Each structure stands twice: as structure tokens, then as C-alpha cells.
Amino acid sequence: MALVQSDENDFHALREAQRMVDSCQDFADHLIVAEFLPHCRGVAYINIRTLEQVIYCVQLSRAGYRIVSYEFDDVADEVANCDTVYESAHQLLAGISPLYGEKYGFGREPLGKRKEKQS
């Protein structure tokens, strides 16, 4: 789920956020478009509770996904200044959820297949 757009006018943050939520629902304990933060064409917010039960509010913009708080529907100044931007939803989830990487094998062979080969 990379943010690849052919034209600057094609990007619509809220639509992309909903698409990410719909396609990645199984990869987190809770995943929803933020309800109480303002969205615009260029910026939307997503609430995530990882498989480890860690809470994040993530900003989605043309640049990618960026953590802005450790609470739902919140932008914390000290967190919002974070420079880490993830280009795709799967990079974000792999970066914040070790269980996601183990369970779904992002960037490597899925754990189940590795165990089968070892047997």
C-alpha cells in the first residue's frame, strides 16, 4: 500500500486513509480513521492499536505515514515533530509492531513458511 500517485491532484488523504484501514484491518488489533481530528484533502489521521496493544495516532499525507501521538485522536507536539516517515502502510506496521513482522513476514519470508522448511 505505497503512496504512488500519478498526479498531485490525485492524492486525497481521507480516501487513502480509509483504503489503508480497509486493507490492513487484519494486521492490527484496532485500526480506524480518526474521528475527532480534522481531515483535509492533503492530511488525514489514523488510529492504530498494534498487536502488542500499543496505541498510535498516525498522520497520512503525500509524504507518507508519520506518528503524531501515542493516544487516539491526538497530535502531541513532542511526537508530531518526529522526522520518521514511512512510505507505505506495511513499512509503518513493520516499524511499530514486531508481532506484525513475525506473523506476516514483512520484508522476509513469513514465519510459517520458514518453520515448514526447517522440518
From Swiss-Prot:
Recorded family membership: Belongs to the GSKIP family.
Gene3D superfamilies: Hypothetical protein (hspc210)
PANTHER family: GSK3B-INTERACTING PROTEIN
Domain of life: Eukaryota
Protein name in the entry: Protein GSKIP homolog
Organism of provenance: Drosophila melanogaster
GO biological process, one term: regulation of canonical Wnt signaling pathway
Xref: SUPFAM superfamilies: Hypothetical protein c14orf129, hspc210
Molecular function GO terms recorded: kinase regulator activity; protein kinase A binding
GO cellular component: a single term: cytoplasm
